[in-house]
């Protein structure tokens, strides 16, 4: 243990601060007041290596619509439930997306997040989660994702083992439960849009230096 043997371990520990979710600054933005909980937004780089699961969304039974936002989308088979909305800048996206959920899912399967991109969700803090929440949308995330426990605790969305679970979970949810989730998202979204995550860290650093 090099750090420990040289007495540097505690120094490094004191200098580490946990950011949590990334901020998503959108000054003056007001989220949509009405959302359709049977519509799901999928935003980001839609290349096949990262979002290969898109071709198999037809395996997910139910009356859901998937709205895609981002570059590199290649439609392999027509699916009336999948709608490509085009490519927008990060600043434009929150005003464009009106769906009821934002999906955080990577890999080539609807059954689990697979491959390098899917496995990375076990460790990283996906920026698209901040995008969705700042836009006013609850999120749907893989149950093994690093952010899944926090999403459950804060009641900011759904965590699933497989995308095939989504229709039943949404159908079981009452309108009151969904509205409560939207209220939770509203509060978190305000913090992300105002840059509260970074401000919290800078306040901690300043406090430690005093």
Regions found by a protein language model. Give the residues of each.
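Hydrophobic/aromatic beta-strand patches that form the interior of the parallel beta-sheet core
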Residues: 17-19, 67, 103, 140, ...
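A charged, aromatic-enriched C-terminal amphipathic alpha-helix characteristic of glycosyltransferases
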Residues: 161-164, 168, 175-210
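Short, conserved active-site loop motifs that form the nucleotide-linked donor/cofactor pocket
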Residues: 16, 81-83, 157
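Single conserved hydrophobic/aromatic residue that forms the stacking wall/gate
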Residues: 1-12
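A short helix->loop->beta-strand "cap" motif at the edges of active sites that frequently abuts
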Residues: 13-14, 137
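A short acidic/histidine/glycine-rich donor-binding loop in glycosyltransferase catalytic cores
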Residues: 154-160
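Nucleotide-sugar-dependent
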Residues: 96-135, 141-149
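Conserved catalytic-core segment of nucleotide-activated headgroup transferases in glycan assembly
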Residues: 21-98
């Amino acid at each position: 243990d090099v750090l420990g043997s040289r007495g540097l371990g505690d120094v490094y520990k004191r200098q580490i601060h946990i950011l949590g979710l990334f901020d998503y600054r959108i000054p003056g933005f007001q989220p949509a007041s009405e959302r359709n909980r049977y519509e799901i937004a999928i935003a980001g780089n839609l290349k096949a290596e990262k979002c290969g699961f898109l071709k198999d969304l037809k395996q997910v039974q139910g009356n859901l619509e998937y709205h895609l936002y981002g570059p590199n989308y290649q439609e392999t088979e027509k699916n009336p439930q999948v709608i490509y909305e085009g490519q927008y800048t990060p600043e434009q996206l929150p005003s464009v997306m009106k769906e009821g959920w934002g999906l955080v899912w990577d890999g080539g399967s609807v059954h689990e997040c697979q491959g390098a991109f899917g496995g990375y969700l076990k460790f990283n803090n996906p920026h698209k989660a901040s995008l969705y929440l700042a836009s006013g949308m609850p999120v749907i995330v893989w149950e093994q994702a690093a952010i899944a426990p926090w999403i459950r605790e804060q009641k900011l969305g759904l965590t699933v083992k497989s995308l095939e679970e989504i229709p039943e979970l949404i159908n079981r949810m009452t309108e009151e439960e969904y509205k409560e989730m939207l209220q939770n998202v509203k509060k978190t979204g305000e913090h992300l849009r105002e840059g509260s995550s970074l401000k919290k860290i800078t306040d901690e650093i300043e406090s430690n230096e005093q």
